Structure formats: C-alpha cells, structure tokens
C-alpha cells in the first residue's frame, strides 16, 4: 500500500492525505507540530493509520468524524481496539437520527449552521454543523485547513437523497459555508471526503480556497433555488437511493 501524501504544512501543523477503499475515500491526518499529537478524520482503515503514526513517531489522540456513513467510520473500532480505547472520538449528536451510536463517542451538540471550538494538541479548530448530506454532518476549519467531508466536494457537493439527508438543508449549509469562506485566507487548503473529475477533466484531491470557489457548482448555484434544483448531483436513481426510500418508509 502506498504512503500518505503530505499535502499541507505550516508553522503549526502537518497534514497528510490518503485515498483508501473502493469508494475513493480521502482520509486526513493532522499532526500538531508542538505536541506531536495527531487527529485522524474519517478513518477508513484503522491499522493503516495506527502503523503510520507509530512509524512517524507521533501519538494518535483523536478521531473526528465529519459524518457516520459506513465508509467514513470503517476504521474507528479497529483504532480504538489498537489503542486500548485511549482515543477521543468526536461526532455530532444529530448523527444519532440516522441510527449511529457509540458508547465510546463524545458528542458535539451545537445547533445546525453554527460552530463550536475544538482542540487537540496545541491546535484549535472550529466545528461547523452543516446538515444535508446527513443530519449531523460537520465541516472542520482552522489553521488554513478546511475539511469538508461529504458536504462539499471540489466541484460539487454530497448527495442529500440518502437516509437522513435533506436537500434544502444541504443548500443552506452550502450558503452558510460560503459566507464562512469569505472570512478565510484564500490560500487555505480545501480537503473533501471523496474526489471526482471536475469540468476541466482533471481529478484533483485538494484545492486552494480561491480556486475552489471558482469551480464549485454547488457554491455558485446555492443562492438561486431554481439553479440549485437543477444540479445533477443532488439525487441519483440507484440502489442507495432505493435503500433510503425504504428506510424512510420504515421510519414513517
């Protein structure tokens, strides 16, 4: 297996990105330079990240989840087992609405379209509740880093037609984040949960914020309900959509 790519570094942190799994998941490991503590976001493979941290001589202390679809939590239990449950696992409590539970988790409880501060090592980030793809999806921002999970991809956004998703809340989350982005350095790095081809034919895995704001169709359509409704990536006629319809019917 290939090694993670060092995709961003400043005076406070080092950030590694790695593709894992058959769904092109992008995992992100943030290392605090001061304390040598590390936080893994949405781990797909627990053993992979445990071994990587051991080899790097850093202490993995935190797991943060942008949301709880299976491909974003697959490595959580293995990491907890490998570290004798010594990791801090954080997730938004609204993810319980789609059935996620863990007796090892600590829960963010702030409201939709709002933020709270969260620390690990000597680093502070803001955790923004951005529902739509799932009820308790969060976007992680701080220190020139933006981890969008499945709320926003580089050219599009996550689908809101799965169980627990909500198309209008997804639009509101995109508008909310667009306003937040206006306050950030244009050289901040945007890190999505998956990567797909964009209009110029390239398939980037990250982008600086200034470029991202130009190419992202969701960001540039969310202000207009009609344009938003016409976006082709908000819903799909596939097995996952059918499963979501059945789950909603079961819960109603």
What role is predicted for each listed range?
Residues 2-5, 172-252:
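Accessory terminal helices/loops
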Residues 3-56, 139-149:
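Conserved beta-strand hairpin/beta-sheet module of binuclear metal-dependent hydrolase folds
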Residues 24, 38, 44-124:
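Active-site HxH/HxHxD metal-binding segment of metal-dependent hydrolases
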Residues 28-29, 114-141:
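Core dinuclear metal-dependent hydrolase active-site scaffold
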Residues 43-45, 68, 95, 132-134, ...:
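Active-site metal-binding loops of divalent metal-dependent hydrolases
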Residues 63-73, 128-136, 191-197:
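Histidine-centered catalytic micro-motifs
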Residues 97-102, 155-163:
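A short acidic, helix-capping loop that chelates divalent metal ions and anchors anionic groups
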Residues 157, 161-181:
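Active-site-adjacent loop/tail segments of enzyme domains
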């Amino acid at each position: 297996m290939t090694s993670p790519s060092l995709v961003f570094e400043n005076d406070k942190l080092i950030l590694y990105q790695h593709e894992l799994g058959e769904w092109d998941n992008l995992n992100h490991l943030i290392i605090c330079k001061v304390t040598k503590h590390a936080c893994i976001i949405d781990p797909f493979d627990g053993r992979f990240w445990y071994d990587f941290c051991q080899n790097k001589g850093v202490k993995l202390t935190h797991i943060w989840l942008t949301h709880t679809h299976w491909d974003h939590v697959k490595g959580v239990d293995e990491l907890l087992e490998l570290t004798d449950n010594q990791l801090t696992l954080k997730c938004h409590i609204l993810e319980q609405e789609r059935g996620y539970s863990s007796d090892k988790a600590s829960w963010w409880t702030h409201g939709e379209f709002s933020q709270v501060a969260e620390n690990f090592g000597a680093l502070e980030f803001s955790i923004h509740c951005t529902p739509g793809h799932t009820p308790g999806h969060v976007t992680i921002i701080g220190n020139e880093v933006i981890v969008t999970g499945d709320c926003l991809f580089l050219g599009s956004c996550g689908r809101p037609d799965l169980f627990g998703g909500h198309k209008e809340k997804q639009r509101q989350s995109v508008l909310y984040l667009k306003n937040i982005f206006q306050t950030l350095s244009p050289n901040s790095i945007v890190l999505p949960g998956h990567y797909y081809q964009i209009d110029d034919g390239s398939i980037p895995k990250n982008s600086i914020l200034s470029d991202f704001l130009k190419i992202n169709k969701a960001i540039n359509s969310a202000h207009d309900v009609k344009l938003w409704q016409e976006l082709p990536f908000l819903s799909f006629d596939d097995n996952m959509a059918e499963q979501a319809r059945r789950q909603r019917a079961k819960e109603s």
